[in-house]
UniProtKB/Swiss-Prot annotation:
Induction: By abscisic acid (ABA) and water stress. The keyword Lipoprotein does not apply. It comes from the Eukaryota. This is Dehydrin DHN2. GO terms for biological process: cold acclimation; response to abscisic acid; response to water deprivation. Residues 1-92, 131-156, 173-232 are annotated as: Disordered. Pfam families: Dehydrin (PF00257). Residues 73-82, 143-156 have a biased composition (Gly residues). Signal peptide: none annotated. Belongs to the plant dehydrin family.
Length: 232
């Protein structure tokens, strides 16, 4: 049988240790086609997914990646996919400043009131009820003081105000006798202090007589029918 095979030109091919046919290449690495063997696309075995370079050799088996001639996984690309996001934010700062000055103008209040006959003593009210009596002089000054106001006459200062009242009464009887007793001086002071202020009332009654007679005695002398009139 072997003679018939040799007669028809059956050629043997060189194989490696694994039984794969060995290809001869030239000095540039290009395969040299043999006299026999598989030719064309039918004799080509491709290993790999995609190849970039095409091989027009015959009877070749290509194993490996990125072969110059053959089909392999020669994947690459100019364009790569990467994520490098750059995020820049421009912050706009806003400042809030509230500088508000509050200035108040101070006010000084000065109030002076003069009331004539508002605060009368008990004896003055009695004399008004009796006809024929005469009050020579009655003077009443009522001055109100606030927390920031001061009157001319001075005095004390309360929390919300102070009222200072002074009453003077001078009675001259008709006879005007001057004895050893001289002058009778009566002074009454009433003070009322509360949360809303202070009230100061001063009443003075001056009576000139010779025998230290009381005010009621002088009033009785002026009344008709009492027998106290001397006719002087």
């Amino acid at each position: 049988m072997s003679q018939y095979q040799n007669q028809y030109g059956a050629q043997t091919r060189k194989t490696d240790e694994y039984g794969n046919p060995m290809n001869q290449v030239d000095q540039y690495g290009n395969p040299i086609s043999g006299g026999g063997g598989l030719t064309g696309e039918a004799g080509r075995q491709h290993y790999g997914t995609t190849g970039g370079a095409t091989d027009h050799g015959h009877g070749q088996q290509h194993r490996g990646v990125d072969q110059t001639t053959g089909y392999g996984t020669h994947t690459g690309g100019v364009g790569g996919y990467g994520t490098k996001p750059e995020y820049g934010s421009t912050n706009t700062g806003s400042g809030y400043g509230t500088g508000t000055g509050y200035g108040g103008s101070g006010t000084t209040e000065y109030v002076r009131e003069e009331h004539h006959g508002d605060k009368k003593g008990v004896m003055d009210k009695i004399k008004e009820k009796i006809p024929g009596t005469e009050q020579s002089r009655t003077h009443t000054d009522g001055t109100g003081y606030g927390s920031t106001g001061y009157g001319a006459s001075g005095g004390g200062i309360g929390n919300t105000g102070q009222e200072y009242v002074r009453e003077e009464l001078t009675v001259h009887p008709g006879d005007k006798k001057h004895g050893s007793a001289g002058q009778e001086y009566v002074k009454e002071e009433r003070r009322g202090i509360g949360n809303t202020g202070q009230e100061y009332v001063r009443e003075e009654h001056r009576v000139d007589h010779g025998e230290k007679k009381g005010i009621m005695d002088k009033i009785k002398e002026k009344l008709p029918g009492t027998g106290g009139c001397t006719g002087h």
